Amino acid sequence: MWLFHGYMPEFNQKGEKMSGKQLKISEKKRFPVFTFLFFFILLCVAGFMFYMAFKEQVPYWISDFKSKQVQNEYTSFGEEADGTLPYDFADKKNEKKNTKEKPAKTKNIPQDWNGVDWNGLKKMNPDIIGWIRIPDTAVNYAILKGTSDNYYLYHHMDGSYNILGSIFAEKGTSLQLDDAHTILYGHNMASGQMFGQLSNYTDTDFWKNHSYVYIYMPDRTMTFAIYDVYNCLDNDETYTIGFTLGSNDFEKWIKKTLKKGYYSTEFKPAGDEQIITLST
């Protein structure tokens, strides 16, 4: 590396001519200094790159830690069982207080009724209106609704700032999530957090093993079958809302979405059935 070579004078500081031996000794004394400098700079560059990579990952680690902390503190979902219908809040209210009878087992539905500490969640953040969960995936988060559609793009479910944001509904969405068409948004994170695993649904095997989405509300549990998977632009008619259940417009919209899917599924919704869209 010529940048690390210095000019070797022919005479020493006393004005005496230096012999070949002296020159050789001088070179040996100076070379380690430049070697040290080279490795020092290299170490600094490597350290800086490591620091930047570490700094970039910190928000992801913090978000993951805080999300799991909320999940562990405020939710407790049981194992899935066999059957077809969810154990709803209405069934819970109709049970006798001291009965030891368990609800009928259901297929792909959490065995416990709700498993969410709504009082605790509401105290943590009043903007929480529900909870979304796809078993055996990273999708296990509170659903939020803020006064602005942009707020929870960059705020955690506890209300603190975080670049990963949260799962949220548009500000015009019903607080009961009972609109004909509800859209829930979440970032498409390469880490798999938030809605980062939705891209896995391009694989039919993944869909077969994760074909239900569960929405938990303070008064009920809703089960949605995933009937369509596709990519679209943000101005696509997929994002149309404001439908009325059972209306012709809603039925036409459903038929159009069925034509967009990457593959056909066994589920075909009717115009009187509520639809949710998970969007990144």
Name every feature range the model reports, one short phrase each.
Residues F4-G6, K14, I41-L43, Y51-M52:
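Sec-dependent N-terminal signal peptides of Gram-negative exported proteins
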